Structures are given as structure tokens and as C-alpha cells.
């Protein structure tokens, strides 16, 4: 198994825990996009990008991609915390995701990261992912 950062693991769980029913299931592109938007929101709050805990590249199609996050997603799938359907779309196993997050109750930064991830998901409810991709590609 490839390595991943603890923060990418938390975020991969938090995305699934906070994902509104109306957005389910999500693609791996959306998974990375929601994480990236959380990082951008943290930047706007005055946090250094390096403090996010893992990095991104932007694909030639304009989507953010994090190897650490992808490795975390792969781990969640192997552990049965998330399901992948025949179209490659992800949905949570809610009970297992919630229980796993509870194992990290002692991590002080989780509530803040949860709020950033939740806000990034709320953006998806009002801004089409294509518009977000266009903005990322042109920066």
C-alpha cells in the first residue's frame, strides 16, 4: 500500500461523513475537488497551504489531484468504509465512516477541517463543478 498523510485520511473520511445525500455518489474527481476547495478555504482564512498536510497537482484537464488523498481513498475502499459502484462512483458506509472518525476524537484539528470540508461541499450545492474546474485551470 502506498503511503498517505494522516490529514488526507481524515479528509477522505470527513468528505464522506459530511457528503449531502443530494450529492451522492461522487466521482474521484469530485472527491479531490472537495478536498482542494477545503485547502483553498483554509488559505483564505490565513493558513499556509503547506499546513494543509498534503499537496495537489492540477491535471491537464484542470482538476486538482492529490496522490496522498487518492491513497487514503483507496485505503477506505479496501477497509469497506466506502463503496464504489459499477460506474466508479463513491458512497459512504455511514456507520463505519462515523465510527472511524470517532477513533480520532483526540485530534484537535478535526473540527476545523470538518468545517472547511463541509463548506467545500456546500459550494458544490450552489456552484457547478465545471465552473470550479474552469477557475482552477485558469489560475
Go through each PLM region and give its residues.
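Domain-edge interaction signal
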Residues: 1-139
Amino acid at each position: 500500500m502506498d503511503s498517505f498523510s494522516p490529514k488526507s485520511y481524515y479528509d477522505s473520511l470527513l468528505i464522506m461523513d459530511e457528503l449531502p445525500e443530494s450529492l451522492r455518489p461522487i466521482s474521484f474527481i469530485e472527491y479531490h475537488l472537495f478536498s482542494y476547495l477545503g485547502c483553498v478555504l483554509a488559505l483564505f482564512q490565513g493558513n499556509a497551504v503547506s499546513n494543509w498536510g498534503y499537496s495537489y497537482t492540477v491535471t491537464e484537464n484542470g482538476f486538482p489531484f492529490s496522490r496522498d488523498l487518492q491513497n487514503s481513498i483507496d485505503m477506505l475502499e479496501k477497509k469497506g468504509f466506502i463503496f464504489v459502484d459499477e460506474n466508479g462512483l463513491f458512497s459512504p458506509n455511514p456507520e463505519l465512516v462515523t465510527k472511524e472518525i470517532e477513533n480520532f476524537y483526540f485530534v484537535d484539528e478535526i473540527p476545523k477541517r470538518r468545517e472547511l470540508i463541509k463548506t467545500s461541499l456546500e459550494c458544490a450545492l450552489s456552484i457547478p463543478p465545471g465552473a470550479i474546474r474552469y477557475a482552477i485551470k485558469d489560475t
